[in-house]
Regions:
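Alpha/beta catalytic barrel-like cores
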Residues: 1-160, 166-177, 183-184, 193, ...
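Glycine-rich phosphate-binding active-site loops on the catalytic face of alpha/beta enzymes
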Residues: 199-205, 344-363
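Conserved, mostly hydrophobic/aromatic
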Residues: 161, 241, 282, 328, ...
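Histidine/acidic-residue-rich catalytic or RNA/ligand-binding cores of hydrolases
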Residues: 169, 294-296, 334-344, 359-370
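Glycine-rich beta-to-alpha transition loops that act as phosphate-gripper elements at the mouths
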Residues: 159-163, 324-333
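Glycine-enriched alpha-helix->loop->beta-strand junction motifs that scaffold or abut catalytic
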Residues: 192, 278, 340-349
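Alpha/beta enzyme core
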Residues: 106-119, 137-141, 145-150, 172-320
Length: 474
C-alpha cells in the first residue's frame, strides 16, 4: 500500500470534512465535521501501529495548523515581560496532563475560550514520558487534536518539562546521559515542542565552598544543552529555554544562587553562541514538593510557599532579560493559595499531581482495585518502611498510568464526561486564580505563526526506545 493510500485510510473517519491532495496537501472542507470526528484519528495517533500512528500524528498537526491552532514558542512573550512590555500580574499555568491528555486538553481549551485566555502551557516531563507511555509526538497529537475538537485557534505552547539529567547515571557515564537528553530534545522539537526546560540542577554540588562553585556544573551543562537546543530550531522558531537552580523540595533558592547560575550560564553560553538568545525563565525552589507530602491517612500535608522569595527572584530574573521565576510542584496546594502566585509576579507555575488526583477520585471502584493490585505486584519494591497503604498507593499510582492507558480511554462515555467536567472546573478555578483570563490579545501581540511546514517523513521514523526514568523528577 502506498503512503498516500495509508494516509487516506487513517483519515477515513473524517470523511468529506477534509481533502487530501498530492504532496500530500491537506485542506479542510467542513470544520464542524472535522471537530466532531477528530477523536477517532487521535485514537490512532495514540494506539495505532507504528506507521498508522505516525501518519495520524502528522495529519493532526497539519489539520491543527490549518485550523489556526499552531505549536508555538512562548520565548518572545516571556522576554517581553522581562522588558516590562506586558503586565506581570498573572502567572502562566504549565499543565502536565499525564492521563487522558486529549480529554483533559479539551477541558483546558474550553476554559481558555470561555475566559479569553491564551497564556497557558501543556507539558510533559522526561520521567512522565516513561511511566505514562507517551512519546512527544503522541502527546502533541493529543493536545492538538483537542484544539481541533474544541475549535480553538491561536498559539499552542507545548513544553518539555524537567528534561533532567540523572545524577546517578551522569556519575557513571556522563556523555551517554547527556546524549539521552540531546536525543529527547531532537525528538521533542520534531513533534512541535518549542519550549524546553533543561534541568541540570541535580548536579549542584553543595560540598563546594562557594555558591558559584556549587552551581558550576549546573550552569556549564545547561549552557551545553541550551546550545544543542538552539541548533535544533526550525526556521522561524526561537525555542523558549528554561534553566533550574534548585531541586524541588530542597532548601529555598537564594539571590546569590540565581546570580551565580545566570552569570555563569551567560558566560558559558555566550562563548558557544555569541549572538543567540539565552534563557527566558529560571526555575527556583520555594518550599513545595512534587506531588505533595503524603500523610499516613493518604491526605496531603499543608506546605508553605515563600512567596516573598518567589517575588524577589522574579524581579532579579528580569535583570537577566528573563520573564521571571518559575515554581514547580504546586498543584496540591490549597486552592486559596493560587492567587498568591499572580500577586507575587511569578512567571509560571507547574501543575500535575492535582489533575491526576481528580482522575483517581472519579475512577470506578473495581478499576481502582485492579490498579492497586497491579501496584502491589509490580512496584512493592518502592514501599518504604513504615509506609501505610494509603501513602504507598498515593505515591506510586502514577506508575499505573501507562499500563492502564487504554482502559482509561475505554471508560464509559458518561464517566469520561464526568472526569472532563471535574477537570474543567479545576482549570476554570486555576485560570481565574492565576489571572490568565483575557490574555489572548497580549500574547498574540508577541506570538505569531512561524509558517513552518512539517514533512511527513519526520513522523515515519523508528519509535524512540524506552529508558529508565525512575530517579527523575516530574
Amino acid at each position: 500500500m502506498s503512503t498516500m493510500d495509508e494516509l487516506i485510510r487513517v483519515a477515513k473517519p473524517l470523511g468529506e470534512s477534509i481533502h487530501i491532495g498530492e504532496g500530500p496537501q491537506i485542506s479542510i472542507r467542513n470544520p464542524k465535521g472535522l471537530s466532531d470526528n477528530i477523536e477517532a484519528v487521535v485514537r490512532t495517533a495514540v494506539f495505532g501501529e507504528n506507521r498508522s500512528k505516525g501518519l495520524a500524528q502528522w495529519l493532526i498537526r497539519k489539520l491543527a495548523v490549518e485550523s489556526g491552532a499552531f505549536p508555538a514558542s512562548i520565548h518572545h512573550f516571556y522576554r517581553a515581560r522581562g522588558r516590562g512590555e506586558t503586565p506581570d500580574d498573572f502567572t502562566v499555568p504549565a499543565m502536565n496532563l499525564r492521563a487522558l491528555p486529549f480529554h483533559a486538553a479539551r477541558a483546558v481549551f474550553r476554559s481558555a475560550v470561555s475566559t479569553d485566555a491564551c497564556a497557558f502551557i501543556f507539558e510533559i516531563a522526561r520521567s512522565e514520558m516513561g511511566y505514562t507511555d507517551q512519546r512527544p509526538a503522541e502527546y502533541a497529537a493529543a493536545i492538538l487534536g483537542a484544539a481541533i475538537a474544541e475549535g480553538y485557534s491561536g498559539p499552542v505552547f507545548i513544553q518539555g518539562d524537567h528534561f533532567q539529567v540523572s545524577a546517578s547515571r551522569y556519575g557513571k557515564d556522563p556523555e551517554t546521559e547527556l546524549d539521552a537528553i540531546r536525543s529527547l530534545m531532537k525528538e521533542s522539537v520534531h513533534a512541535g515542542f518549542f519550549n524546553i526546560d533543561i534541568d541540570t540542577s541535580t548536579l549542584v554540588d553543595l560540598s563546594k565552598k562557594t555558591i558559584p562553585a556549587q552551581q558550576e556544573t549546573n550552569y556549564t551543562l545547561c549552557a551545553d544543552l541550551a546550545t544543542d537546543a538552539r541548533k535544533l530550531e526550525p526556521e522561524g522558531v526561537t525555542i523558549s529555554l528554561g534553566g533550574e537552580i534548585g531541586e524541588v523540595g530542597g532548601e529555598n533558592s537564594t539571590e546569590p544562587e540565581l546570580r551565580a547560575f545566570m552569570d555563569g550560564f551567560n558566560r558559558e553560553f555566550g562563548s558557544r553562541l555569541p549572538d543567540a538568545p539565552g534563557l527566558s525563565k529560571i526555575s527556583i525552589q520555594t518550599g513545595t514538593s512534587h506531588g505533595g507530602i503524603v500523610l499516613p491517612d493518604g491526605s496531603i500535608a499543608k506546605v508553605s510557599v515563600d512567596f516573598d522569595t518567589l517575588q524577589h527572584l522574579s524581579k532579579v530574573a528580569k535583570e537577566y532579560q528573563m520573564g521571571g521565576a518559575v515554581q514547580h510542584g504546586a498543584s496540591t496546594l490549597p486552592e486559596n493559595m493560587f492567587s498568591h502566585f499572580a500577586e507575587s509576579n511569578a512567571l509560571e507555575v507547574h501543575l500535575a499531581t492535582g489533575f491526576q488526583n481528580i482522575l483517581y477520585d472519579h475512577l470506578p471502584g473495581d478499576m481502582l482495585e485492579e490498579i492497586y493490585a497491579y501496584l502491589d505486584a509490580k512496584h512493592s519494591d518502592e514501599r518504604k518502611e513504615g509506609q501505610t497503604d494509603e501513602q504507598f498507593y498515593y505515591k506510586t499510582r502514577k506508575r499505573a498510568l501507562g499500563p492502564f492507558k487504554q482502559q482509561f480511554w475505554e471508560l464509559p462515555s458518561e464517566k469520561l464526561g464526568e472526569i472532563e467536567s471535574a477537570w474543567e472546573d479545576q482549570f476554570q478555578l486555576l485560570f481565574g486564580s492565576l489571572n490568565v483570563g483575557g490574555t489572548r490579545q497580549i500574547v498574540e501581540r508577541f506570538i505569531k505563526p512561524s509558517g513552518l511546514d512539517v514533512k511527513l517523513s519526520a513522523y515515519l521514523g523508528a519509535d524512540a526506545g524506552e529508558e529508565d526514568v525512575s530517579d527523575l523528577a516530574d
